A protein has these predicted regions:
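Noncatalytic linker/hinge segments flanking ATPase motor cores
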Residues: 6-7, 73-79, 92-106, 168-176, ...
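Catalytic cores of PAPS-dependent sulfotransferases
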Residues: 47, 52-73, 108-126, 131-140, ...
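Alpha-helical structural motif
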Residues: 4, 113-116, 155, 159
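Generic alpha-helix signal with a bias toward terminal, lower-confidence helices
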Residues: 44-46, 65-68, 72-75, 91-92, ...
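Phosphate-binding site of ATP-dependent enzymes
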Residues: 2-94
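C-terminal active-site "lid" helix and adjoining low-complexity regulatory extension at the edge
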Residues: 133-189
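A long amphipathic alpha-helix within ATP-dependent nucleotide-binding catalytic cores
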Residues: 22-37, 78-138
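Short secondary-structure junctions and interdomain/linker hinges
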Residues: 15, 41, 124-128, 170
Length: 189
């Protein structure tokens, strides 16, 4: 117990996001949450299947599927159109290419997963909604606003442009610089 407590306290002191330029995490107070252990899916290796829905303002666009994740060298991935479950693995490149060796059947709870992804992603220009399926029911994993810290190289340029075209950003708000000395640096002339 003492060793676990030490490890958790050490983890809580780390500034999550510092090394990956994910500054949006800095304002969040770190917490440890203990959850019930979800059973693994023996038909697909040593872990649950992780369904990662890339969503754009409430619209699930595609789903990256990951399983067998206990060892990085054994990870398997797949890429599917979120609505039709058509395999779109031809868009996979780079680090995922060698891992793209699976054909995962359509999850029994896909319609409920899509409904959950729609509701959870509504109002966000882009967010990844991660879900699992346990006993035919969707289970929430997490919301991810910067997949792979914004440095994911696992998709082709064409697919990145297709996903990027799904984003509709609100008009930028003009604000005064937060540092008064910065105003002089921004003036021209």
């Amino acid at each position: 117990i003492r060793s676990i407590r030490r490890t958790l306290n050490h983890t809580l002191r780390k500034k999550f996001g510092r090394m990956t330029a994910e500054h949006h995490y800095f304002g969040i107070k770190p917490r440890i949450i203990a959850e019930r252990l979800l059973p693994s899916e023996p038909a697909f290796g040593n872990s649950l299947i992780d369904y990662k829905f890339y969503c754009f303002d409430g619209n699930p666009y595609c789903c990256m599927v990951c399983y067998n994740r206990k060892s990085p060298s054994d990870v398997k991935t797949g890429l599917y159109d979120a609505r039709t479950w058509k395999n779109i693995g031809h868009y996979v490149t780079g680090k995922y290419y060698d891992q793209h060796q699976c054909d995962i059947p359509r999850p029994a709870s896909l319609d409920r997963m899509l409904d959950a992804a729609k509701r959870l992603s509504s109002g966000f220009p882009q967010v990844r909604v991660d879900l699992y399926e346990v006993a035919g029911n969707p289970v929430f994993g997490e919301l991810t606003f910067t997949s792979s810290a914004g440095m994911d190289t696992g998709f082709s340029q064409e697919f990145q442009e297709l996903m990027g075209s799904q984003i509709s950003l609100p008009p930028a708000k003009r604000t005064q610089p937060s540092h008064p000395g910065l105003l002089g640096l921004l003036e021209i002339g």
